[in-house]
């Protein structure tokens, strides 16, 4: 398998690449080439790929997925695509949506067109539960209507639909995955867990939006990578698969866990004005990937948080 990984210097992408190279996740064929293309924006970091870069099968190309000439040349040398590259921060999308439309929608279109021309064997499109909006009770199944509430979520919903349309129109071998909120080492400190952990380690307060009762399901990045490998290897073309973590908590409950893990007092909580379009609750039903492909999350949340906090303690130079 010669796989092109877009956004592979980012948080989830770099964990996926490292797991591919190390053999920690199973693949349908032996991995003979792993090429990462990443523009190295604020969320991308070559240090995330230090382990993978020592392997002769690995190569890195700095570039933008919207660059048609670059993508055309790369696609010609690969037979599989794992598409992680995206602008992903809701707050940034509220302030300026243009980069999200460009990267998440137009960039995906550039990749799909090139993949179609070069008869790519499988195109794995990595997405998010945020495309569904908010759910008060129960959990979303894959067939639930999309109802994104932020520009970021809307751009991802559009890219999902575009990828699936290439399967319907052209018969392209596309699989879409949608995941819960990820956490783990090497996550850029704009997302809640690394933001709060790094602020607490620096002796600062942590900003909790609104009343703190928004609910999220949390997924360790290693579990996500295992789910992605299953979808890549055995998922049915044209299908969507949910990859969930199975651990829900309010933001306030999560904050209290992080305070304890970092040895900080409750006085470090600072309630701030809620953000625009803040979804109240996310919850994915991942019984489809469990039943078809045997996926189960393995990382206990308490253990995962302890590992994550320990990593940020030990790697201050990475985030300062």
UniProtKB/Swiss-Prot annotation:
Keywords on record: Lyase, NAD
InterPro entries, sorted: dTDP_Gluc_deHydtase, NAD(P)-bd_dom, NAD(P)-bd_dom_sf
Residues that bind substrate: 88, 128, 181, 191-192, 207-209, 216, 251, 274-278
GO molecular function: dTDP-glucose 4,6-dehydratase activity
Family: Belongs to the NAD(P)-dependent epimerase/dehydratase family. dTDP-glucose dehydratase subfamily.
PANTHER family reported in the protein's UniProt record: DTDP-D-GLUCOSE 4,6-DEHYDRATASE-RELATED (PTHR43000)
Role, per record: Probably involved in the biosynthesis of the acarviose moiety of the alpha-glucosidase inhibitor acarbose. Catalyzes the dehydration of dTDP-D-glucose to form dTDP-6-deoxy-D-xylo-4-hexulose via a three-step process involving oxidation, dehydration and reduction.
Assembly: Homodimer.
Protein name: dTDP-glucose 4,6-dehydratase
The species this protein was found in: Actinoplanes sp. (strain ATCC 31044 / CBS 674.73 / SE50/110)
